[in-house]
Regions:
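Short, Lys/Arg-enriched, Trp-marked, Pro/Gly-tolerant hinge/linker segments that flank
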Residues: 124-137, 150-208
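Short beta-strand segments
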Residues: 62-64, 82-86, 169
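Residue-level marker of positions within ordered structural domains that often coincide
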Residues: 21, 42, 88, 151, ...
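Short, Lys/Arg-enriched alpha-helical recognition elements, typified by the DNA-recognition helix
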Residues: 140-147
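Generic protein-terminus/edge-of-domain signal
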Residues: 1-77, 91, 95-131
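Short regulatory "switch" loops immediately downstream of catalytic or recognition motifs
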Residues: 86-94, 175-180
Length: 210
């Protein structure tokens, strides 16, 4: 399941934190009007949302959606980050394959783009997975930085926290695209990137003497 996400717009963060339940715990039932992000550091979380059951493990990224009832269905110890936020242009996608094909094309266009051009090589829409296993532990660094910023409550702390969360989302979208491409055996060869960049350069500079 994918959610479209306009990368030109920051999320509005209401709350961000980290909880460590060392004793088995079960999530309470609720329906809220905002997105909730969970990133599991250690342990397990058992959730059902809108009748679908999920088992989250260490390293998992998960997004709860507004307006859908969610609750736990099994007790477990769990250490996790959470963020409650809204976003003006974020919605569930119907055609996931088409969305990922579009994102793969955006990656190709970005790789062959000239980075001094004023215009961005693609539009601002990316796609976030609802559930994804993060490939490394680096996510801890950016989430810990965001949490420190949020807890410090210095000037513009929510905007700075939102910017960090936004960066994290873009990284997750990128890693999900790479993981999906690897699973499907698709990879843009370096030679193709070089050829595309050379073609772009020639098109831009064909009137100049070489």
């Amino acid at each position: 399941m994918l959610l479209s996400y306009n990368a030109d717009l920051l999320p509005r963060v209401r709350m961000l934190g980290r909880i460590n339940y060392t004793e088995p715990w079960i999530h309470f039932s609720r329906t809220i009007d905002e997105y909730v992000l969970y990133v599991i550091r250690d342990g397990n979380m058992y959730l059902q949302e809108d009748g679908i059951f999920y088992h989250l493990k260490a390293g998992d990224f998960f997004l709860l959606e507004p307006g859908l009832c969610h609750e736990g269905y099994q007790r477990a110890a769990c250490n996790y980050y959470y963020a409650h936020f809204t976003h003006p242009e974020m919605a569930r996608m119907k055609d996931e394959d088409a969305a990922m094909a579009l994102l793969a094309e955006k990656r190709r266009l970005s790789l062959v783009s000239y980075n001094l051009d004023e215009a961005d090589p693609t539009d601002s829409i990316t796609y976030l997975p609802k559930q994804f296993h993060l490939p490394g532990s680096e996510f801890n660094t950016i989430l810990r930085t965001a949490l420190d910023c949020y807890n410090a409550r210095e000037e513009h702390y929510k905007r700075r926290t939102a910017a960090l969360l936004h960066s994290f989302f873009l990284e997750v979208a990128h890693e999900h695209l790479l993981a999906r491409g690897a699973a499907q055996g698709k990879k843009l060869k370096k030679s193709e990137v070089v050829a595309e960049r050379l073609l772009h350069y020639l098109n831009e500079n064909y009137t100049r003497p070489l």
